[in-house]
Amino acid sequence: MNDKILKILEFGEITKRLSKLAITAPAKEAALKLRPSSNFDQVQNELKQTLALADLLRVKGRLPLTDFQDVHPSTKRLGVKANLNAQELGNLLLVLSLANEINKFLEDVDDEKLNLSAIDSVLDQLDVPDLLFRELKKSVDYDGEVLDTASNALARLRHDMRSNEEDIKNRMDAYTKGNSSKYLSEQIVTIRDDRYVIPVKQEYRGKFGGVVHDQSASGQTLFIEPEAVLNLNNRQQNLIAQEKQEIRNILKHLSSLAREEINSINNIANSLTRLDFLQAKAKLAKEMKASEPKLTQDHSLELRNARHPLIDPEKVVPNDIRLGGDYDTMLITGPNTGGKTITLKTAGLLQLMAQSGLFIPAEEGSKVGVFKEVYADIGDEQSIEQSLSTFSSHINDIIAIMKNVDKETLVLIDEIGAGTDPEEGASLAISILDFLRKKDAKIMVTTHYPELKLYGYNRPRTINASMEFDLKTLSPTYHLQIGIPGHSNAFAIARRLGMREDVVKNAQNLMADEDSDINKMIAKLNAQTKAATTARNRLETSLDRSQKLEQKLQQALDWYNQRVQKQLDFAQERANEVVAKRRKKADKIIAELEKQKNVGVKENKIIEAKGELNSLERQAHNLAHNKVLQREKRQHHVSVGDQVKVLSYGQTGTITKKLSEHEYEVQIGIIKVKVSDRDIERIAKNNAQPKKKLVRATSAIRRSNAHSELDLRGQRYDEAMTNLDRYIDSALLAGLDIVTIIHGIGTGAIRKGVWQYLRSSNHVKGFNYAPANEGGNGATIVKLK
């Protein structure tokens, strides 16, 4: 796609908005570099992936992503046998941790409700190297600090350092707080040359033994290491040297492990960037209230209620724009300032967005083709250096278009043939259009030449269009009318403004008969189009109501059928139980009868009784194996001590208390929750042990209902605190490590309550305000244990 079209249609403004919605630096950069593709399969794949993230954003909320530094420079250094520093290893840990968080976030997504197959290739790269992750997690933190747990030797050294440092402090306190403090410039302990010293007044130098390490600028203060702490300071320096060596050994070991996983690390970083980039696309779609465009193979364009994305949403006027099908060329005629140019730009910009894998601000069902090139000549782009006139610049642009145009090209020309003698300009415009049409291009042009009004009537596959003008308000409505050419409405406007009638009539008489007839025809077409549009809107509204009513009736019927079936199933279950009991009792009776044949009971009576019982058995056979009944029975017969599955959490637990007729208390791990009997299912004892979850390898995975964020805005304080408590329980059960609490700014009461709760919770590892682009002081990021 040529760069000029991106500039003309302001595509860069779209990529800037997209970049701001990304979280990570690599994704922000990718957003700014986004360009339209002319490959059909690639565009289709991009749109499918954007749809997957849009659905995920709608159902589960935002991915648990935070910004991270690009790790590719670090993996390159690993590739040349270099060892990484602690900060670089901390960055690797963050990348692997984010991959783990996303895997957990997606674990319980129901594939029947959310199809993520389009991003399987991205998710499959999030396979975290277990050994490397464990070693990094115990050795460094995200800030690049080496932890005591990195090795036993380091833990021992740091313990000795802290103990020795305490001894030094105690000795120094004797100087700063005891009788010797009067000899000091300040009662403090400071450090010079990595050794603990005290500031001694110069005249009392002899009161202290030891070593002078420094003096003040005036020379009045000497920084002395007292003799009493010399050995302790020496020991501290020795421990520090040992610590540094041990840290070097640890970093070397971790670098060696990371070197074996270079490909995995790069793949994970690339996938995180890709997911962030796709999520930014989904956020932009939500922000613009955009929808997924459907791709067509015939290079047609059908935009329903299309809106220009750079115009204020409160002011923009949506329009239907169609090109292809019955016509390939559209001429938008009429006066200036009516919205012709904006309509042209809307069509072009939405086309570029779609071919970039972005959703477009138009109604669902909108269709676009995939063009090899989009060319435009819009506005005054005359070159000062070449001293070209507006007309010359205009013609130069069109010449360049004519050299490259073909059937896979969309051409947008504003005011074709303008800037010269109207008669010659109109003739040239007609000739240019004829040439472009022969190349089978899709063409949209605007013009104010009246000579072109008949073009749409005497050329095949060509249609006129115009921008609607309200004669009552004497202002444009900015609505595109397809099928009729526009006109100036000069006489009507003059009358409305109070022009003398005789002057207006004289002007009308001065017009050529042909022009007068054309204007009358246009006026008639305008009236007919308005009537047809009103009728169509009325029919569409009626059809929409009918479809919604049909849907509601179908839902009601389905609900009724389900209720009836449940009642029948329950009745059959009870009947099955009765038959089973009777059969067992009858078998005992028959056994007794057979023993008593010699008492006078006839054998044919026994056979007859067996036949009747077997008939009952056959009738009950299906009931005994009815899976629905078995499931219902499990669900409705539970008691304290039973192991159950809590359906809303997807977790197993034990019933600890019956709270009411239909409500139980269930303990899941360390958490107790209140649940309805409709939300639990009893688990048979031999199935009580849950199967170990498998790490995600394909899209066929189950995922929880827990979201990674909670929005408390607009809630009362008590309500917000209750919802927060429940949400933290849900997040812990779902295995989430990082969640976002959105409390807003307002008076600060909710935020204070949230922070007070988090400080008191034993399940919270840490928390802080969200980054500026994720809510700032209006949201809190929480790390769970």
Swiss-Prot record:
GO-annotated biological processes: mismatch repair; negative regulation of DNA recombination; rescue of stalled ribosome
Positions of the Smr domain: 710-785
Keywords tagged on the record: ATP-binding, DNA-binding, Endonuclease, Hydrolase, Nuclease, Nucleotide-binding, RNA-binding, rRNA-binding
Pfam families on file: MSSS (PF20297), MutS_V (PF00488), Smr (PF01713)
Signal recorded as keyword: no
EC number(s) stated in the UniProt entry for this protein: 3.1.-.-, 3.6.4.-
Residue positions binding ATP: 334-341
InterPro entries membership: DNA_mismatch_repair_MutS_C, DNA_mismatch_repair_MutS_core, DNA_mismatch_repair_MutS_sf, MSSS, MutS, MutS2, P-loop_NTPase, Smr_dom
An MF annotation (GO) of this entry: ribosomal large subunit binding
Keyword RNA-binding in record: yes
Domain of life: Bacteria
Family designation: Belongs to the DNA mismatch repair MutS family. MutS2 subfamily.
Function: Endonuclease that is involved in the suppression of homologous recombination and thus may have a key role in the control of bacterial genetic diversity. Acts as a ribosome collision sensor, splitting the ribosome into its 2 subunits. Detects stalled/collided 70S ribosomes which it binds and splits by an ATP-hydrolysis driven conformational change. Acts upstream of the ribosome quality control system (RQC), a ribosome-associated complex that mediates the extraction of incompletely synthesized nascent chains from stalled ribosomes and their subsequent degradation. Probably generates substrates for RQC.
Subunit structure: Homodimer. Binds to stalled ribosomes, contacting rRNA.
UniProt name for this protein: Endonuclease MutS2
Source organism: Lactobacillus helveticus (strain DPC 4571)
